[in-house]
């Protein structure tokens, strides 16, 4: 038993030393190898359900289909007894609200029934559920220095990510398990000096088309740790 403890301690020491020497790019490759070992994201074609529960217990259920190979995206949302279906085919967009493509300006404003919002939601879901693979997209700037940091009493390897101005202005931090390289937390700031933005804790894993995706994402404000809600993937 004593020998096993010594071996494990030595393993952790060498693993930690190796992790400290990783560059941002090397860390990204290791976490992608954990989440998408067969490079399935490139031609991803599948669907999944996301149940969002806000802090005040409001529920929104979304059936999402992502077809990167054919540049298709669709989302069917049920909220407050209303059903919205959105489909994007390359640059074309169609919205159906409660079974009709015709709806009032009041409904359009209240339920955000615009193609601008549809493209925004497509980008949102393909980004978050495409992580960490999406960090290889053009315009992404990886900090070459990987840091070790404790977050909520747990130690992580942390990768800082910014973007070219044409892509985005937020600053992101991605927290990876130092043993498995699994992505377990991410955090973003609009203005880091103000401690704004949010952090998202990832729990459990669901495998979709060979890709390990987070089953539960819980959202909190950076400034006061206020709980905002969670998404559950099925």
Map each language-model feature to its residues.
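N-terminal mature ectodomain segment of secretory-pathway/periplasmic proteins
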Residues: 26, 30-101, 140, 147
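Bacterial Sec-dependent N-terminal signal peptides
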Residues: 1-24
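N- and C-terminal low-complexity/disordered segments
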Residues: 46, 60, 78-79, 87-89, ...
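Short, surface-exposed beta-strand/loop "edge" segments at domain boundaries and coil↔beta transitions
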Residues: 54-62, 80-86, 101-104, 166-171, ...
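Flexible, processing/modification-adjacent segments and terminal tails
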Residues: 20-26, 96-166, 193-196
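Intrinsically disordered terminal and processing segments
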Residues: 23, 30, 34-38, 81, ...
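Gly/Pro-enriched, hydrophobic low-complexity segments
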Residues: 150-234
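Catalytic loop of the DD-peptidase/beta-lactamase superfamily, centered on the K-T-G motif
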Residues: 84-94, 101-104, 110-115, 228-233
